[in-house]
Amino acid sequence: MQNNEETYSKTRSTGQHPSGVHGKKSPRLPKCARCRNHGYASPLKGHKRFCMWRDCQCKKCSLIAERQRVMAAQVALRRQQAQEEELGISHPIPLPIAAELLIKREHGGSSSCLMLESSSTQTTSTPTSGSTTSSDGKMLIQDIPSITSRGHMESTSELVMDSPYYSNFYQPPLYPYYNNLYNYPPYQMAMTAESTSGNDMGGISGPPMKSSHRNHPAAYVPSQSGNQWQMKNGDNRFSGHSTSSQFRMHSYYSPYLGQSVPNPACVPSFLTFEEIPSYSEAKASVLSPPSSQDSGIISLCSNSPVSNESTKAVAKQEPNSESSAFTITAAAEDGE
């Protein structure tokens, strides 16, 4: 090895080739940088293990060692990024803001180190000028794998689903009193009783009004005019709507929530004069507001035997009271 180095150094100084052929030039071979710095020209092939200045601690050799370590770390980082891209777990690195950049000058301005406060990656710039010791180079080798492993852990933690973010998609409806977003006009809940037709009970009788979801909690009470029968709410949830008195929408829940749920209302389809003696008394008994607070709708079940017996008992008592009143008035007239 020593003879080869001496011959290469002589040919470099004299410019003569050992082959003696002046017309041909030998192909350019990579030379050892450490040997070149010490004044020797040694081919790099097969020379890495046997270099005399491999463990040299001089100024030039320490710079070469630091450069080799930085290049090896960069190659390892590129290889890891390529593997992450193949696996599909890489994510774009956000650009740092100018306020987050912190430039630290070390060793009296000899080398600059660029550090990011918020991001998980940290890039170190290669030293341009100045001198650094070998201990600094060893610290770089120890720090770079820890930085890459920390960045890998933080990148995997970002893949976890953020539950508060996805829970914001499920919000309560904007209009809780409507089934959908369309504001349909409320349907008519008024009943009119014609006073001209004496025997017609069509305004009162008819098919029962039932709801598949809930019972109507309001009562039919005569208005001030006396001809219209409107529904009266316990709590007016739509006070802001400018609707007339005969267009009222029922509330969703009963105002008496503590009491038991009433049975569905049963309205008779027709009324006969055999059970009820007079039309005026029937009108007064059917259309009077209820006294109990359990149900808001008048319930007259003609199918049950109890209701039939009660109506017959009322019908029997009313003629007796009329006959007693007639006898009292007749006796008073005879006395006069």
UniProtKB/Swiss-Prot annotation:
Which stretches are tagged as biased composition: Low complexity?
Answer: 113-135
Instruction: Identify the DNA-binding region of this protein by residue numbers.
Output: 32-79
- Locations of Polar residues compositional bias? 1-17, 288-311, 318-327
InterPro entries recorded: DM_DNA-bd, DM_DNA-bd_sf, DMRT, DMRT1-like
Keywords recorded for this protein, A-Z: Activator, Developmental protein, Differentiation, DNA-binding, Metal-binding, Nucleus, Repressor, Sexual differentiation, Transcription, Transcription regulation, Zinc
- Which is a Gene Ontology cellular component entry for this protein? nucleus
Q: Which PROSITE patterns match?
A: DM_1, DM_2
- A GO molecular-function term, please? metal ion binding
Its localization reads: Nucleus
* Superkingdom, taxonomy of origin: Eukaryota
Q: Where is this region: Disordered?
A: 1-28, 113-138, 285-336
Its family remark reads: Belongs to the DMRT family.
Q: What does this protein do?
A: Transcription factor that plays a key role in male sex determination and differentiation by controlling testis development and germ cell proliferation. Acts both as a transcription repressor and activator.
Protein name per UniProt: Doublesex- and mab-3-related transcription factor 1B
